[in-house]
Structure formats: C-alpha cells, structure tokens
Amino acid sequence: MSDCCNDLGPLGREEVDVLHVSRGVSRRDFLRGAAGAAGLTAIGGLVSPVWGQQKRVRLAFCSQLLCVVPYEATRAAGFFAEEGLDVELVYTRGGSAALQALNGGAVDYAATSFDAALNAFSNGADIVRFASTGRLPLFALATSPDLADEIKGVEALEGRTIGVSALGNADHAFMLYLLERAGVDPDSVEFATVGTNLYDAIRLGQLDAGMVQEPALTLLQERGSRVLVNGMDIDDANEYLGGAYEFMGVATRRGELEERNDEMQALARALGKGLRFVQSTTPERLVESLPSEIITGGDRDRLANTLERYRESLYPTAVDMNLDAMQRVIDVNRAAGGRGGNVDLDRIVAPEVVG
C-alpha cells in the first residue's frame, strides 16, 4: 500500500528504519528451477558470484508482499548479478520511508507506488521515475459480510462508514474517485482511518466497507463479503479507470541521472528479466523466492494462489513506463484533491532511460 508523504524529510543511512534486507542469489535448487522455467542456460553459473566484481547498490521499498515479488524474484533468480549488480533490497515501513531514504542519500533507488512518488515530488523531493514493475493498485473495495446483499454497488455507499488506511493515501484517493464517478457526495460518507489492518473491522461489521489488500480480500470473500471494485483485476481497472493504473516502479535522484545511466539501464534489464520470470515460473517458486522473515506465520499456499490469480493483471512483462497509466494516477489524485494531482508528468519521469 502506498502511503502519504506529506511529512517528507531526508533520512540519512543511520536513520532508516530497516525491517529486512535481501541480498545475493538464492540457493542452487531454486536457481536450477528458475533456469528451467525461464528457458535460461547460464543462470547456474550465478550461484556463487564474485561479489567484488559486482556494483553494489541499495534499493528501498515498502514491505507489502505483492509489491516486492518482482524484486525478490529478480534477486533470487540471479538476474541482478547477471547484469553486474549486487543489489541490496531494503525493506522500510512504507513508501514514504523509502522515498525519505532516497531523498536523504541513504539508498540509491526507491521502489514505491506512483501515488507515493507524486506526493514526495510535490513536497520537494527532486526524484525521477524511470522503470515500472506494477500496473495496478494493490487494494479492493469490499463490503462487510453482513451487508453484502444490501450494498451492491459504489452508489449504495452513501451514508456509510468506509475504512481506508489513512486520509491522503492512495486507497483514500482511489475511494474518493470512485465515489465521484458513482455520483456520491464524499461528504455523505464517513471515512474511518484504521491503518492497513482493516480486515477485522470489516469482518465484524464495525465498518460497512473498506479498501483492503490480500490476503484480507480473500478471507473476507470466504466469509461472504461482496467485492465492489477490485483494483488488482485488469477488467475492473478497464471498467472503472479506463485502463492500467501505474503503481510500483523505481525512482532515483534527478541530479544523478547522467552518472547512473549505465547502472540504471542494467537495473532495468534485470527487472525486465525478473518480470518475465514472474509470469513464466510457478507461483510456488515465486513464494520460495521471498525471504522467510516476511512470510513467517503466513499461509504459503494462500499466497501462491493469490499470485496465480493476480500476477498476469498486476505485473507487466517489461519495465517500460505506460505514460497513460501514470496520467490516470495524477487525474485520480486531482479528483481527490491531493497535491499529487498538480504534478506535471513530464517533470517526474525519465522514459528515455529504458528506451
């Protein structure tokens, strides 16, 4: 989930609140499977890379599982190493923290939602986006189980209480846009900000509806909730947004574009291979590529099923940025009254990096 960057300030390396760090390639049996799934022959030689010959870079992102899949798959399959990069994947507490780390020089790159990047840019962060790894938002609008038969569309939310992670976040902006599209006055609904843990509040009927992520969405559906709009489904994105809605992607500091050009191209090539691998391998192998620390206690089979269901919709097969999808995010933020809606797209993108 993207988060608001209204309090953006630079963080030095020693100030970053790091939840987890991934680095290197995975064990040999994973790489053998990755090579077979991706039709590669040279990947096995990457099991023991000579790290002294790799260019060390730090890339920070939030810790939402579906956001990190392409990055961890790229790392685990050895595609970063294949491009001469030793990429340290730094897990932070949300997109704003990752962008603060980038803004302050603690990391070289930040992978966040485009909403978060727009908010950061509008608050003075001189960043530029050059690669895309996610083309849909990672949340859906679902009702409480008890109201599934009563609330059958967004228009029925008038006078209801709707849960979002926080006012100003991507899910809040998206919700405001959906209300406007359905002809519902946003002032007629009550927004409850309960962080990202909306599941229990919706399940228990404390909220009439809310913007949820996986696995909460699947769990609510199993209990009878109605899904009004699923941002993770390309068909719903086409119906409600007119197409893809730029989400995860990579940014760096604008002042370093020229000096990092070769490095950025190598990073983009590696991620492009990783995105294609995400579509070609098994969901179980994708789950295997994730650090055990971030799925401890989670249902690995459920996560694999989620990836099988959504990966084709969520993840592109190339890192080239879809400028129309990015403009949709700006338009949604503008409709919601967010500062990100005032950003000129040309000022925050560098599509020439990946051609």
Region annotations inferred by a language model:
Residues 327-355:
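Conserved C-terminal helix/tail region of periplasmic/extracytoplasmic solute-binding proteins
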Residues 82, 149, 233-243, 312-321:
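Short, solvent-exposed loop/beta-turn-alpha elements that line the ligand-binding surface or hinge
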Residues 197-203, 207-291:
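Pocket-lining segment of extracytoplasmic ligand-binding domains
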Residues 257-336:
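Secondary-structure end/capping motifs
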Residues 69, 135-141, 225-226, 246-250, ...:
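Small-molecule pocket liners
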